[in-house]
Amino acid sequence: MAYRDLRDFITQLEHLGELKRVQAEVSPYLEMTALCDRTLRAGGPALLFENPTGHNTPVLGNLFGTTRRVALGMGVNDVSELRQFGHVLASLKEPEAPKGFKELMGLGSLVKTLWAMAPKELRSAPCQEIIWEGADVDLARLPIQHCWPGDVAPLITWGLVITQGPHKARQNLGIYRQQVLARNKVIMRWLAQRGGALDFKEHAALNPGQPYPVCVALGADPATILGAVTPVPDSLSEYQFAGLLRGSRTELVKALGSELRVPAFAEIVLEGHIYPDATHASGFEHALEGPFGDHTGYYNEQDWFPVFTIDRITQRRDPIYHSTYTGKPPDEPAMLALALNELFVPLLQRQYPEITDFYLPPEGCSYRLAVVQIKKSYPGHARRVMFGIWSFLRQFMYTKFIVVVDDDVNIRDWKDVIWAITTRVDPTRDTLLADSTPIDYLDFASPVSGLGSKMGLDATNKWPGETSREWGRPLTMSADVTARVEQVWQTLGL
């Protein structure tokens, strides 16, 4: 589905019956969360709240509440079609020598297509039609959601954070939640391993005492948002990949107060800086963030993160505020992960051809548990795959549990997976434990914040050398009997 910006996408979703306008008054304080959560769990449409309590700005929620809408946002009709983008990313991440002239020409065509999708910079843009500066900068003027009763403050959730490290040509796009701290201040909760935090760390080391520019785009088009959460190779701009998804170049405009480039058709853009603060060990202003309800289904603990001071807010005329909540799966991040799972399969298969399928069940908080199907070739093969997944992509750095099964097990069917675990696993022999590894800061089960253990389960059939016993043979019915019974079955009317 081709579209230019979020508004165009909304119009097309409504035409497809994938968006519902909510004309009743609904409060950003808790009520939007409750209504979006109920709608998502029912497989319902995106919701456009046209009358948010206390505000004139409509709120868009549940945009990515189904895998189909994620697929539509990436320019295809079905989630199964996303593997084509996975093959593109695999070619770019780990390029191999072409196996022939035809493949060489195909790779050249891919590079040419990506080059043609380089972002286009505009001199002026809709996102700067209205400008708030000075005392006009007040986040209370925006319908920012307060998602859960125990949340300490309203929370910006779908903000596309734009940063750039010193001496880097490429800007980084990331989605990090932001706690509203004051009328013009938010807390930027980016984890140390994320791109925005790394850019900021480099700036702080090379330019101590100098403010660090940041922009946050709210209501960017879906392709740009999804490009920011996709494992794009470091050599490729997320803006460029968004153009590939959208089928047209991403249009950008220079921010008014820095050299950063922002999406030209974003609904709202927050421009500002992280300012120096000699009282903090980092040399920059920090504040205690949280607690907030998170995708784990719990409130997370508090921690210190940088304070982003907003110098100006630019926006389109009659802007739309794009928001979400996170909670016990399923939520929007879980639906995103379920769809993006299809991108990961070709990426992993390029590095590990023995992987025949890969699944991140949403019940596992989107990334904490992975089930891997392999074509086993030798003893210890499952363990090689476990270590490979943990180290190959940054997205799997925080995966706590990996279950590896043979290619006769349907990894998207829990009944089949549990059968494999209970019949093919000896807890002592087939459990791999790794201690003191990077763990999600939000994982309160780990003994130390950000550092914990991982577990791998080898639920494959065991080969000689892995067991001294005769291994069981799965029960199967003969093909001729199955065919005969099928004929009888058709006569029973069952």
UniProtKB/Swiss-Prot annotation:
Compartments in which it is found: Cell membrane
Pathway(s) per entry: Cofactor biosynthesis; ubiquinone biosynthesis
Presence of keyword Flavoprotein: yes
A molecular-function term among this protein's GO annotations: metal ion binding
Cofactor: prenylated FMN; Mn(2+)
EC number(s) reported in the record: 4.1.1.98
Source taxon at top rank: Bacteria
Active-site residues, Swiss-Prot/TrEMBL: D294
GO CC list: cytosol; plasma membrane
Main location: membrane
Cofactor binding note of this UniProt entry: Binds 1 prenylated FMN per subunit.
GO biological process, any: ubiquinone biosynthetic process
Binding site for Mn(2+): N172, E238
Record: residues binding prenylated FMN: I175, Y176, R177, R189, W190, L191, R194, G195
Protein name as it appears in the record: 3-octaprenyl-4-hydroxybenzoate carboxy-lyase
Organism the protein comes from: Albidiferax ferrireducens (strain ATCC BAA-621 / DSM 15236 / T118) (Rhodoferax ferrireducens)
Phylogenetic lineage: Bacteria, Pseudomonadati, Pseudomonadota, Betaproteobacteria, Burkholderiales
